[in-house]
């Protein structure tokens, strides 16, 4: 389905409800620049670290597209676990996994309440930015503690610049991108308002500091487009 969530006046803050879940895949592809390329790169990097029967968690798995793609492209059999707190998302994830013949354990839970046992890889695509900063850093420390030795954490985030002029230019460039994807000025402004105080981005350096503070030995930016970035962190 085509994303038309914000072509009407908003009455609430952004949330991953049934309306959003029904168009989420289209929303991602049209709202996140080079989303498919980011996903491809993340999977390629992940596959280089994975072995037979490794356990993989996707935090905020939404419709499970990344886990499904990982299963298709990785030569190993993996234990795939998707976690989300939206019933609507998990229902679609379950249907998609069945359609593609991919076995995924789907868990409806708050990310802070899950025990990530024996994880070799933890994924988080545009999820941390929706978690309040103090809780975000606690979760990243939990991720670090849960990973096997030499486990990896791959995550993507919207980022901001410390330079106000550059930050405005980045935002303007992003909105121009959204227009090329068929979103109107009204839809763009409505979504911006709905995300106010819901999505809280860090700078690229702040993300890397958070990772280092959690204990990771290395963090690298493997993809970036203006104010969207993908990182790989190695335990």
From Swiss-Prot:
Residues annotated for S-adenosyl-L-methionine binding in this entry: 35, 60-62, 84-85, 110-111, 125, 192
GO biological process, one term: tRNA wobble uridine modification
Catalytic activity: prephenate + S-adenosyl-L-methionine = carboxy-S-adenosyl-L-methionine + 3-phenylpyruvate + H2O
Gene Ontology terms for molecular function: carboxyl- or carbamoyltransferase activity; S-adenosyl-L-methionine binding
Pfam families hit by this protein: Methyltransf_25
Physiological role: Catalyzes the conversion of S-adenosyl-L-methionine (SAM) to carboxy-S-adenosyl-L-methionine (Cx-SAM).
UniProt protein name: Carboxy-S-adenosyl-L-methionine synthase
Organism: Aliarcobacter butzleri (strain RM4018)
Gene: cmoA
